[in-house]
């Protein structure tokens, strides 16, 4: 990377899976606001569901997710029972039995639920919602614990996409992050899912891990590509031990520096493209016939809390402790602590801890940021016209944009269009950040740009 650009790579900026971002959510938004927003939804619009199951059998030291260890099943069963109640509670505020276009189970490890508890949850969902004929039903799992019986059960419940956290296959790296899973173990799960009819497989990979090199990551990609997952997400490891306690187990001295991280990201991207994958936005890759690649060609790619998506629904209902949702009126996040979340649901209260009511300015800036993140370009004049804003609404960003143009991150034209350059594309988060009014007003802790 050009020396002019390298300074941008170490800037701490959000991943922009929402705007405003989660650090700017406020406890002033609560259950009453969410109830009002739910009842105001257009009953003819499709929506998406996200269900969070925080339980895992082992702690992966790189993980920054909200997760819990449980040696016994009873706490998981209790959680599943409360989740079923929350589904009914949320549905009770909707104007009708609404149609679902996407559903995603995340965690944690959602397949830590028993077949019975997962099945009962799906029965409750089916009672309160209908599914579009082409709905995507996705679930995250762990090849170290996924059984053949659970695979058959998932297929029977209608799931059509599964996601695995592969991260890295090098044994030394796996030991350093406390996630040991040989390639054959992952392949067995992939083969089992596809044999059962769940043909769509996602892998997550991470660069910037302890002891990781360009060589280990490239070899991991070769092994992954041989299994032909439909989608691969490639994330940079964010070392934030002050936020994610498990990361305190990672030897910070073994982490690659900024130049090595950048080399890993570039080598991985080039390897995936060479192996037939289409680059999607900042950090995703897909086979050419995958709906995500089609969305890029059609200009319909979106970005949400799961990353890049084909989901165009304007409402995402989050259920489960710490889950995040969105309606056209704003964002909400549920209570993170499971006992407090349980008490709220048992009391018949929507378990909202905080959120953000969207202003017209939020909607405008969020649209611009999403266009940059998804398409690598944005028409600022069109944004102003579409959102009924003056053309100079982004005046405070102009000095930064001018500098970024001089440094070769972006092209600009007289029609107020911005396009990422090839060299600047990996730094799109940094460009998006100049439109973030909250980031300008209040410094927040985020991961570095690459």
Give the ranges of each region predicted by the language model.
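A short, conserved structural fragment
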Residues: 405-415
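Local cysteine-cluster metal-coordination motifs and their immediate loop/turn environment
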Residues: 51-67
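Minor-groove-contacting beta-hairpin "wing" of winged helix-turn-helix DNA-binding domains
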Residues: 416-421
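Short, amphipathic alpha-helical interaction segments positioned at domain boundaries
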Residues: 423-450
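Flexible, acidic/Gly-rich N-terminal and inter-domain linker regions that tether
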Residues: 1-48
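Short alpha-helical scaffolding segments that buttress acidic/His motifs in well-ordered protein cores
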Residues: 50, 63, 367-371, 431
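C-terminal scaffold of the Radical SAM
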Residues: 39-46, 69-93, 99-389, 449
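Short amphipathic alpha-helical interaction segments
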Residues: 390-405
């Amino acid at each position: 990377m050009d020396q002019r650009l390298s300074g941008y790579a170490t800037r701490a900026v959000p991943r922009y899976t929402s705007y405003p971002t989660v650090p700017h959510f406020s406890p002033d938004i609560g259950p009453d606001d969410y109830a009002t927003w739910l009842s105001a939804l257009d009953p003819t619009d499709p929506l998406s569901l996200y269900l969070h199951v925080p339980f895992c059998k082992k702690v992966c030291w790189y993980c920054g997710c909200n997760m819990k260890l449980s040696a016994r099943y009873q706490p998981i069963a209790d959680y599943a029972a409360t989740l079923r109640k929350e589904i009914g509670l949320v549905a009770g505020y909707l104007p009708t039995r609404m149609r679902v276009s996407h559903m995603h189970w995340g965690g944690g490890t959602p397949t830590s639920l028993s077949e019975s508890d997962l099945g009962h949850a799906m029965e409750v969902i089916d009672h309160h919602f209908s599914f579009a004929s082409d709905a995507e039903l996705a679930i995250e799992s762990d090849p170290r614990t996924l059984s053949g019986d659970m695979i058959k059960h998932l297929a029977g419940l209608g799931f059509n996409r599964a996601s695995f956290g592969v991260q890295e296959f090098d044994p030394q790296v796996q030991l350093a992050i406390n996630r040991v899973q040989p390639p054959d173990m992952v392949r067995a799960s992939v083969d089992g899912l596809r044999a059962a009819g769940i043909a769509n497989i996602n892998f997550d990979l991470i660069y910037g891990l302890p002891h990781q090199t360009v060589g280990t990551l490239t070899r991991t990609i070769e092994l992954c590509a041989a299994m032909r997952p439909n989608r691969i997400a490639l994330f940079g490891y964010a070392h934030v031990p002050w936020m994610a306690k498990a990361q305190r187990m990672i030897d910070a001295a073994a982490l690659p520096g900024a130049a090595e991280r950048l080399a890993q990201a570039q080598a991985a991207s080039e390897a995936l493209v060479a192996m037939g994958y289409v680059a999607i936005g900042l950090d995703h890759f897909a086979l050419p016939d995958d709906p995500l690649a089609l969305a890029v060609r059609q200009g319909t790619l979106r970005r949400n809390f799961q990353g890049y998506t084909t989901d165009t629904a304007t409402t995402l209902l989050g259920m489960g402790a710490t889950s995040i949702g969105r309606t056209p009126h704003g964002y909400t996040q549920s209570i993170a602590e499971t006992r407090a979340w349980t008490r709220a649901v048992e009391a018949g209260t929507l378990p909202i801890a905080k959120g953000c009511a969207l202003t017209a300015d939020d909607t405008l800036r969020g649209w611009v940021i999403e266009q940059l993140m998804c398409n690598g370009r944005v028409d600022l004049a069109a944004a102003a016209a579409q959102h009924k804003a003056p053309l100079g609404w982004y005046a405070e960003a102009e000095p930064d944009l001018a500098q970024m143009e001089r440094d070769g991150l972006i092209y600009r034209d007289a029609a107020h269009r911005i396009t990422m350059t090839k060299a600047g594309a990996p730094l799109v988060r940094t460009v998006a950040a100049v439109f973030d009014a909250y980031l300008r007003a209040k410094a927040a802790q985020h991961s570095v740009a690459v």
